[in-house]
């Protein structure tokens, strides 16, 4: 028995949702006006001539801080449904959630020791 036929709606949705952005990019590339020149290579700064060097380096400290924030934000998303149904799920789910929180605490201690949480 081939069980993938039960998921034909999912495969059709996956195919359409994959082809739509590709089709949109191809249509925009085909219909976009082609204009090359030195004005296209300059950086846009609110309609005003760029003052100084517009290409600045992005500090990696901001990236690390944002990455740690996203990790803890995702942790909240995963723990919220568990907290809402805590009384129904039982002790095994409590142990699994405790292990999950313990892994995240170890990760946050590691990030703290590496200095990812310091803003200076």
Swiss-Prot record:
GO annotation, biological process: photosynthesis, light reaction
GO function terms (MF aspect): NADH dehydrogenase (ubiquinone) activity; quinone binding
Q: What is the lineage of its organism?
A: Eukaryota, Viridiplantae, Streptophyta, Embryophyta, Tracheophyta
Whether Lyase counts among this entry's keywords is no
Q: Which reaction does it catalyse?
A: a plastoquinone + NADH + (n+1) H(+)(in) = a plastoquinol + NAD(+) + n H(+)(out); a plastoquinone + NADPH + (n+1) H(+)(in) = a plastoquinol + NADP(+) + n H(+)(out)
Describe the protein's quaternary organization and the partners it interacts with.
NDH is composed of at least 16 different subunits, 5 of which are encoded in the nucleus.
Q: How does it sit in the membrane?
A: Multi-pass membrane protein
Keywords in alphabetical order: Chloroplast, Membrane, NAD, NADP, Plastid, Plastoquinone, Quinone, Thylakoid, Translocase, Transmembrane, Transmembrane helix, Transport
Reading the lineage from the top rank, the first entry is Eukaryota
Identify one Gene Ontology CC term for this UniProt entry.
Answer: chloroplast thylakoid membrane
The leader peptide range reads none
PANTHER family for the chain: NADH-UBIQUINONE OXIDOREDUCTASE CHAIN 3
Task: Give start-end ranges for the coiled-coil region(s).
Answer: none
Identify the main location: plastid
Name of the protein this chain belongs to: NAD(P)H-quinone oxidoreductase subunit 3, chloroplastic
